[in-house]
């Protein structure tokens, strides 16, 4: 079975963790679309996000406590759901499930650990589907 291609959504505050996670997934052979690797100078970020998502099998949404205030998150979540993509959210430890947006809360999500451990858990979950 081919490994599914994933697109990673994150905020600037989580860029280091997201980069490490993207690299850990790549090290496991999972094809990854990640803005820092795949958006080039002069490109429309929104167009690149949409293109990356269209070419992916799943969206991995890295959430933080302020995610509700970030419109790009909802653009990406809505687009992924509308395209019929699998959506896997990664939330910080100790997150109150009631604080999560309904489209996140109503799907099984992962609790953030080290980028390497989370990438292992994520790649195993994607292959099991």
Place the predicted regions along the sequence by residue:
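Conserved N-terminal substructure of TIR/SEFIR domains
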Residues: 1-61, 81-85, 93-95, 117-118, ...
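Conserved TIR/SEFIR loop-to-helix hotspot centered on a Trp-containing motif
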Residues: 65-85, 97-99
């Amino acid at each position: 079975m081919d490994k599914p291609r994933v697109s990673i959504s994150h905020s600037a505050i989580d860029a280091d963790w997201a980069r490490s996670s993207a690299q850990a997934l790549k090290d496991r052979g999972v094809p990854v679309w990640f803005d820092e690797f795949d958006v080039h100078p002069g490109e429309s970020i929104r167009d690149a996000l949409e293109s990356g998502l269209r070419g992916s099998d799943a969206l991995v949404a890295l959430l933080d406590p302020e995610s509700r205030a970030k419109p790009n998150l909802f653009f990406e979540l809505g687009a992924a759901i509308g395209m019929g993509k699998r959506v896997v959210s990664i939330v910080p430890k100790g997150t109150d499930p009631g604080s999560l947006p309904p489209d996140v809360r109503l799907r099984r999500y992962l609790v953030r650990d080290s980028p390497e451990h989370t990438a292992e858990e994520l790649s195993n979950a994607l292959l099991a589907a």
